[in-house]
Amino acid sequence: MGRKEMMVRDVPKMVFLISISFLLVSFINCKVMSKALYNRPWRGLVLSKIGKYKLDQLKLEILRQLETTISTKYNVSKQPVKNLTMNMTEFPQYYILAGPIQNYSITYLWFDFYSTQLRKPAKYVYSQYNHTAKTITFRPPPCGTVPSMTCLSEMLNVSKRNDTGEQGCGNFTTFNPMFFNVPRWNTKLYVGPTKVNVDSQTIYFLGLTALLLRYAQRNCTHSFYLVNAMSRNLFRVPKYINGTKLKNTMRKLKRKQAPVKEQFEKKAKKTQSTTTPYFSYTTSAALNVTTNVTYSITTAARRVSTSTIAYRPDSSFMKSIMATQLRDLATWVYTTLRYRQNPFCEPSRNRTAVSEFMKNTHVLIRNETPYTIYGTLDMSSLYYNETMFVENKTASDSNKTTPTSPSMGFQRTFIDPLWDYLDSLLFLDEIRNFSLRSPTYVNLTPPEHRRAVNLSTLNSLWWWLQ
């Protein structure tokens, strides 16, 4: 009987504890909901089902006004009748910047319209946010999702206009990511639903460039937004990059690309000094023969790498370059991806004909402002004047000015990364010619490619004089 009385007395306490727990849980949930509400791109009160339905219908109506048909060529799109402007009291949270954030003027960006509200894939619209008027202007049509070739093409079109507020970076230098001494292989990348045929050197270059230019924005806060936006179509670059790890990685790669030290030279000299030629005591002619033989043996035993063959009298090929030069070269390489996809790479294409990729890339050799499918690009930062020794005037470059002497002349030439890129095109052309001849000639040996020594070496490219 006493136990029942105690249980009856404990009932109010249990009810009290349960009610307190319920209030505490509801309070925590309210805080979580308010925090989630604060992070929404369209902020406001918690809507009912009817309110959410009306908001979704409003978004879909705006998207319907933005949608237009995009033609098959990426640089030509059907222009809408007008842009769409709406109020937005705060800067959006889901975006890809096309230029620096300018708090007292206009910021250019690709706005993620769907965000997380409609639970659909991101759909980016090129927009302008006015910080003074607190409005956002959509400039249709939307390019679609990222990654995709349509968004990459729109980013290249915007970079051609150069009206997003990007500025130069002065004399800021960075590492050279155009490696020449790398294994060569081809693969297919999915840029959204599109397959793109890419070689290994292009992947290494664009991937390392994305890291270097993202890190360079710490010093150049008004630069490299467009090329970093392009990189999001191929790579997932972290927002924050460890500078120490990046520098150590690039230095290791740089040492591997540098000329190989003559490790066998001392050993060869020691062997030569201890070895007594068999005919050294007879005649001078025999002495010359044995000396030549000994020299040829030491030369064969010494390792000769492709990186030891230079076209510059420098001790290292991987010198630092200007960050703006790296940006311009990366922009050019992104334009070439258009010609590495279908229908230009169909299996049923004529393999003996000139590829569209070669037709597009050859214009950079003779023209500093080449015309591309996205318009004219200014690549003048990739060239410079150099005084070079000219042995034969008729075979020299036609772009040189009047020489100061019969053996010297000024010549317009390329910076090191562009030279290595053109040399890789020569290597690809050699592989292409070998693959075309191998079915006919069974015992052909693969070509051994060495880096181009001078401009005359690149003349073997069929499109050099086009």
Curated annotation (Swiss-Prot):
Any coiled-coil regions, as ranges: none
Main location: virion
Sites carrying sugar chains: 75, 83, 87, 103, 130, 157, 162, 171, 219, 242, 288, 292, 350, 385, 392, 399, 433, 454
Record localization: Virion membrane
One Pfam family named in its UniProt record: Herpes_UL74
InterPro entries linked: Herpes_UL74 (IPR012564)
Stretch forming the signal peptide: 1-30
PTM annotation, UniProt: N-glycosylated. The N-terminus is blocked.
Keywords noted in UniProt: Glycoprotein, Membrane, Signal, Virion
One cellular-component annotation, GO: membrane
Subunit structure: Forms the envelope trimer complex composed of gH, gL, and gO. The trimer interacts with host PDGFRA.
Primary role: Plays a role in viral entry into host cells. Forms a trimeric complex at the surface of the viral envelope together with gH and gL. This complex is required for entry in host fibroblasts. Mechanistically, engages host receptor(s) including PDGFRA to mediate infection.
Family listed: Belongs to the herpesviridae U47 family.
Stated name of the protein: Glycoprotein O
